[in-house]
């Protein structure tokens, strides 16, 4: 979601921990202020070819989803790199410990590099990630021997969040906790506060009379409970505004509208590596058939929840506005939190670079349905070429969508936050 004002290009490309986009980003794209209503946008500074990586970016802060971690989707506590081998990953998703994957040498997981925090035993994929976490936020958030103590303030906060926010998950209270911890540990606290302030944090779009779906009257009690637990666990005088009722709502809106989903999978990495193998035709057909059947079996056992999942705040990516016909997309091909923004078509210098905030299925729904999702989650009504072309369509969903929405609207809200 594009922020409201200011220039983040220098900050996003700077040397501060977690803020380094690839140097190529400086040449390929830059953030520009568009209007007070739309905020910033990302624009090409040169011609970009289809399939080209516009930039690669680390998040300012990121965190694995709490239910995802609880269900043993093992990921690095800092960069979210999947920690299971591809075979272990497939065995768990299938519920079949006897499964053996062919071509095990194509698995890129290096267990010999994994390290744990000596105090709380959270696991990292490398010494570099353990050190990066320690230097940025983990000194504040390390639970030490209290990791399994349900009365510890941080554990109470996480349990309350899990009881309000069931899968499919879209954010985590720990993303907010890591923001606070980052500022508390920082030598230059004002710099980090300013960096976080670059993200859009409005709780409502007054011009269009839209409020974020998780900040309505229905959820006032849950938000106040979270705020009190958040304050007990993390209060800091220099960040006192974040702990007030309105400040907490703004912080909540910030991670809700700017948080970029992150997905990693050692199995997916193994599949991509196998796809690149130069094999005789018969062996290629056998391997492809094995992989196809493997995914069918996993879908029956585990459904759609295949990846280690979390979310992060990305300075440059957050400047990308939405389009229902995007010219770029985000992905995580390195099996960690490094975000690649890749062109879906040729983009000319001066052209705005847009991604879609909707998934593929949502983009195929009616204009009314698409904008319902965008208003509730991102506080705007889309005016992309596709939406303008469908402007005269009835402001109702199709019969099929109407029936589905009637059955799922309340359930979706309950999935997001349930009464406690």
UniProtKB/Swiss-Prot annotation:
Pfam families registered for this protein in UniProt: SET (PF00856)
Family matches, as CDD domains: SET_SMYD5 (cd10521)
EC number: 2.1.1.-, 2.1.1.372, 2.1.1.359
Cellular component annotations (GO), alphabetically ordered: cytoplasm
Catalytic activity: L-lysyl-[protein] + 3 S-adenosyl-L-methionine = N(6),N(6),N(6)-trimethyl-L-lysyl-[protein] + 3 S-adenosyl-L-homocysteine + 3 H(+); L-lysyl(20)-[histone H4] + 3 S-adenosyl-L-methionine = N(6),N(6),N(6)-trimethyl-L-lysyl(20)-[histone H4] + 3 S-adenosyl-L-homocysteine + 3 H(+); L-lysyl(36)-[histone H3] + 3 S-adenosyl-L-methionine = N(6),N(6),N(6)-trimethyl-L-lysyl(36)-[histone H3] + 3 S-adenosyl-L-homocysteine + 3 H(+)
Stored SMART domains: SET (SM00317)
Renumbered zinc finger spans (MYND-type): 104-142
Domain SET: 29-358
Predominant place of localization: cytoplasm
Compartments it resides in: Cytoplasm
Keyword entries, A-Z: Cytoplasm, Metal-binding, Methyltransferase, S-adenosyl-L-methionine, Transferase, Zinc, Zinc-finger
Domain of life: Eukaryota
One GO BP: regulation of stem cell differentiation
InterPro entries (UniProt xref): SET_dom, SET_dom_sf, SMYD5_SET
Enzyme class name: transferase
GO MF, any single term: histone H4K20 trimethyltransferase activity
Annotated segments matching region Disordered: 392-420
Annotated positions binding S-adenosyl-L-methionine: 357
Described function: Protein-lysine N-trimethyltransferase that specifically catalyzes trimethylation of 'Lys-22' of the RPL40/eL40 subunit of the 60S ribosome, thereby promoting translation elongation and protein synthesis. May also act as a histone methyltransferase in the context of histone octamers, but not on nucleosome substrates: trimethylates 'Lys-36' of histone H3 and 'Lys-20' of histone H4 to form H3K36me3 and H4K20me3, respectively. The histone methyltransferase activity, which is independent of its SET domain, is however unsure in vivo.
Family in the record: Belongs to the class V-like SAM-binding methyltransferase superfamily.
Protein name: Protein-lysine N-trimethyltransferase SMYD5
Organism: Gallus gallus
